[in-house]
Amino acid sequence: MILQRLFRFSSVIRSAVSVHLRRNIGVTAVAFNKELDPIQKLFVDKIREYKSKRQTSGGPVDASSEYQQELERELFKLKQMFGNADMNTFPTFKFEDPKFEVIEKPQA
């Protein structure tokens, strides 16, 4: 009888504690999201700016025409070297078993 009451009481406490912890975790997430340092804020702003530039350009950010031409040349070389294969997949290899010649040993 006492054990049953104890188990009921412990389950009530456990549920109350879990609700309390969930609320505290939500509050601490907001507190940790705050940018305290001005240098950190500048750094995060630059990263966001770079990300938006990269998404709009669809490639490298602030790349000169020489860089783009060099990139195209290197990709062309790779496509020629690997037979116009898809560069994003791992190549498949086909190995054949070597064929050995059977040599008869002379009987001594």
Curated annotation (Swiss-Prot):
Positions of post-translational Phosphoserine modification: S65
Modified residues (N6-succinyllysine): K94, K99
The organelle targeting sequence, given as a residue range: 1-32
UniProt-recorded Gene Ontology molecular function terms: proton transmembrane transporter activity
Alphabetical list of Gene3D superfamilies matching this protein: Mitochondrial ATP synthase-coupling factor 6
GO cellular component: mitochondrial inner membrane; mitochondrion; proton-transporting ATP synthase complex
Subcellular location per the Swiss-Prot or TrEMBL entry: Mitochondrion; Mitochondrion inner membrane
UniProt KW keywords: Acetylation, CF(0), Hydrogen ion transport, Ion transport, Membrane, Mitochondrion, Mitochondrion inner membrane, Phosphoprotein, Transit peptide, Transport
KW Transmembrane helix (keyword) present: no
Pfam families: ATP-synt_F6
Family the entry assigns: Belongs to the eukaryotic ATPase subunit F6 family.
Summary of the function given for this chain in its UniProt record: Subunit F6, of the mitochondrial membrane ATP synthase complex (F(1)F(0) ATP synthase or Complex V) that produces ATP from ADP in the presence of a proton gradient across the membrane which is generated by electron transport complexes of the respiratory chain. ATP synthase complex consist of a soluble F(1) head domain - the catalytic core - and a membrane F(1) domain - the membrane proton channel. These two domains are linked by a central stalk rotating inside the F(1) region and a stationary peripheral stalk.
PANTHER family on file: ATP SYNTHASE COUPLING FACTOR 6, MITOCHONDRIAL, ATP SYNTHASE-COUPLING FACTOR 6, MITOCHONDRIAL
Subunit note: Component of the ATP synthase complex composed at least of ATP5F1A/subunit alpha, ATP5F1B/subunit beta, ATP5MC1/subunit c (homooctomer), MT-ATP6/subunit a, MT-ATP8/subunit 8, ATP5ME/subunit e, ATP5MF/subunit f, ATP5MG/subunit g, ATP5MK/subunit k, ATP5MJ/subunit j, ATP5F1C/subunit gamma, ATP5F1D/subunit delta, ATP5F1E/subunit epsilon, ATP5PF/subunit F6, ATP5PB/subunit b, ATP5PD/subunit d, ATP5PO/subunit OSCP.
The protein, known as: ATP synthase peripheral stalk subunit F6, mitochondrial
Lineage, uppermost ranks: Eukaryota, Metazoa, Chordata, Craniata, Vertebrata
